[in-house]
Curated annotation (Swiss-Prot):
Family assignment from sequence similarity: Belongs to the OpgD/OpgG family.
Protein's UniProt name: Glucans biosynthesis protein G
Record organism: Escherichia coli O1:K1 / APEC
Function: Involved in the biosynthesis of osmoregulated periplasmic glucans (OPGs).
Tagged with keyword Signal: yes
Pathway info: Glycan metabolism; osmoregulated periplasmic glucan (OPG) biosynthesis
Residues spanning the signal sequence: 1-28
Keyword set includes Transmembrane helix: no
Length: 517
């Protein structure tokens, strides 16, 4: 009898162990769990989010919203040894709809509940009973990226499907988004939003954080997986499964949003001690055929859309080229420390276009630059689309380019002139562009290398002069191109690349001179 009891006990223990092993190995939250919800939503009518925000928060100004601060002592995971911490955004202003935030552990999913005790409200007068059941507007991720004993914010997810990410020594600048719909179309843009998040609790030794998100909008839903890998360059690995509810005019995949107010290619119309003011100064593209393209940004007087058609893009990004503080001179906003963002597709994305949208703006508070990939063909509503890519947030722009291919260091615009016999320069009605090219391999070339430029211009202009000379300061080459515009009320397209005989030395400088009206 005793032997039978021991055998039964051993069998029970064995079954318990097997059950534990089965449970721990088979249960795991994944993007497929989010995709099921996204696909289910796509088959139903869209339900607009409802705001539960009291008017004192909904109608507040930005200065008041800034007074609502998260209490750092109450950071989520503060009592765990994980290097990652979470803090949350309170609702206020146009952040007036709650998002659900969940924690994923090895065995369960747990809702992170809102509590006003997480926050200090400064001088904002409010009734505590009216806020006790509010939700969060978003969240931020903290990590000791600059110092082992200090947690710095590295990710912010707040508003629609926007998120911002930085690496070591960087400050927030441009944003990424989950999805863009009908950007710059006359019908108006649709802004999908992340309505729910699932964040995996990291282990003490983890150097990456996994975040899942459910996206929703009137005409699309989506499931997203973000793996954040902080470092000198912070890299975000993105996987998305997108479902259309209804047909869209244009789908923007891996969208980036930035700001360009003025720079040397388009100087400020008013006197300003800051020579440049922008989060990014150009769109870089690595096309499917291997060509590298650089499109300097503008702040046009009218909406401008540029489209670069290709098959299977190798990468694109909005970059901040030129890191010298003297280029910006802004002690408050430190544009010299703002990151570039580079999208690297995984797999073949097929035929489509990298599009750049430039929107007029009068000040730096408005994001007026958008770049994204838009596929030529979209599936019928309900069918799944898969996109995988990484976004690298970096201040090392030269590493975001092929080392054997020279890149544009800067583009400067000037009044075109001709040196007279008396050595005085006389304006001749042209516009001059001074374009400096540099690169690791280019610096190795002897200065007497016969570098020339291949240039072209659209129907609205004429190239009057094009010269290339060695630049001993940058150990690169400088292109000076004088152009005559036929109709100033129209845009003018220009292209240029440096060559040595039949060898291409540089990326293609592709510039659009905005209409001046």
């Amino acid at each position: 009898m005793k032997h039978k009891l021991q055998m039964m006990k051993m069998r029970w223990l064995s079954a318990a162990v097997m059950l534990t092993l089965y449970t721990s190995s088979s249960w795991a939250f994944s993007i497929d769990d989010v995709a099921k919800q996204a696909q289910s939503l796509a088959g139903k009518g869209y339900e607009a989010p409802k705001s539960n925000l009291p008017s004192v928060f909904r109608d507040m100004k930005y200065a008041d919203y800034q007074q609502i601060q998260f209490n750092h002592d109450k950071a989520y995971w503060n009592n765990l040894k994980t290097p990652f911490k979470l803090e949350f955004y309170h609702q206020g202003m146009y952040f007036d709809t709650p998002v659900k935030i969940n924690e994923v552990t090895a065995t369960a999913v747990k809702r992170i509940k809102y509590s006003p005790d997480y926050f200090t409200f400064g001088d904002v007068q409010h009734d505590k009973d009216t806020v006790k059941d509010l939700g969060f507007a978003g969240f931020k991720v903290l990590y000791p990226i600059n110092s082992k004993d200090k947690n710095d914010e590295i990710v912010s997810m707040l508003g629609a499907s926007y998120f911002r990410v930085i690496g070591a020594g960087q400050v927030y600048g441009l944003s990424a988004r989950g999805l863009a719909i009908d950007t710059a179309l006359p019908s108006g843009e649709e802004f999908p939003r992340f309505k729910e998040f699932w964040i995996e609790r990291p282990k003490p030794t983890d150097k990456r954080l996994t975040i899942y998100a459910l996206l929703d909008s009137p005409r699309a839903t989506g499931a997203y997986k973000f793996v954040v890998m902080p470092g000198r360059d912070t890299v975000v690995d993105v996987q998305s499964k997108i479902y259309l509810r209804d047909k869209v005019g244009k789908l923007g995949v891996a969208p980036l949003t930035s700001m360009f107010l003025f720079g040397p290619n388009q100087p400020s119309p008013a006197n300003n001690y800051r020579p440049e003011l922008h989060d990014s100064n150009g769109l870089s593209i690595h096309a499917g055929n291997g060509e590298w393209i650089w499109r300097p940004l503008n702040n046009p007087k009218h909406l401008a859309v540029s489209s670069f058609s290709m098959e299977n893009p190798q990468g694109f990004g909005l970059l901040q080229r030129g890191r010298d503080f003297s280029r910006f001179e802004d002690l408050d906003d430190r544009y010299d420390l703002r990151p570039s963002a580079w999208v690297t597709p995984k797999g073949e994305w097929g035929k489509g276009s990298v599009e750049l949208v430039e929107i007029p703006t009068n000040d730096e508070t408005n994001d007026n630059i958008v770049a994204y990939w838009t596929p030529d063909q979209l599936p019928e509503p309900g069918k799944e689309m898969n996109f995988k890519y990484t976004i690298t947030f970096s201040r090392d722009e030269d590493k975001l380019h092929a080392p054997d291919n020279a890149w544009v260091q800067q583009t400067r615009r000037s009044t075109g002139d001709v040196k007279q016999s008396n050595l005085i320069r006389q304006p001749d009605g042209t516009i001059a562009f001074v374009v400096d090219f540099t690169g690791a391999e280019m610096k190795k070339l002897p200065e007497d290398t016969p570098v020339t430029a291949q240039t072209s211009i659209g129907d609205n202009g004429e190239i009057v002069e094009s010269t290339v000379r060695y630049n001993p300061v940058t150990k690169g080459w400088r292109l000076v191109m004088r152009v005559k515009v036929k109709d100033a009320k129209k845009t003018t397209e220009m292209r240029a690349a440096l060559v040595n005989a039949d060898q291409t030395l540089s990326e293609t400088w592709s510039y659009q001179l905005p209409a001046n009206e």
